[in-house]
From Swiss-Prot:
Name of the protein: Circadian clock oscillator protein KaiB
Superkingdom of origin: Bacteria
The entry's keywords: Biological rhythms
Gene Ontology biological process terms from the UniProt entry: circadian rhythm
Domain topic, free-text comment: Has 2 forms, fold switches to a thioredoxin-like fold (KaiB(fs)) when bound to KaiC.
Cystine connections: none
SMART domains linked: KaiB
Family: Belongs to the KaiB family.
Length: 119
């Protein structure tokens, strides 16, 4: 099986508000569950670093950006729905594609075993 991709993410928040902290907690939970060891997350407080928000054209918080692997994807607002976050960042598709590839390979191996035993 191919090595897993490394995911580079940026979470833009506005201070230590309950909404920002909830977004960070939920996101860390998703990443540790689904992508443990293959992600880097940078949290950017736009109140402390407004120039970074301006450079990256961030207009609202929380905003989550997937930088790598391409394409860049963003989710703005509520990050509490795990599936919405994964789909919005094209991460669920990657997860399903990896599982689909594994399933396809397993099916092919089973078919080969069946064909060999029939002959």
């Amino acid at each position: 099986m191919s090595p897993r991709k490394t995911y580079i993410l940026k979470l833009y928040v506005a201070g230590n508000t309950p909404n920002s902290m909830r977004a960070l907690k939920t996101l860390r939970n998703i990443l540790e569950t689904e992508f443990k060891g293959v992600y880097a997350l940078k949290v950017i407080d736009v109140l402390k670093n407004p120039q970074l928000a301006e450079e990256d054209k961030i207009l609202a918080t929380p905003t989550l950006s997937k930088i790598l692997p391409p394409p860049v994807r963003r989710i703005i607002g509520d990050l509490s729905d795990r599936e919405r976050v994964l789909i919005g960042l094209d991460l669920l598709y990657d997860e399903l594609a990896d599982n689909s590839l594994t399933s396809t390979l397993m099916d092919a191996l089973e078919d080969a075993d069946t064909t060999d035993s029939d002959s």
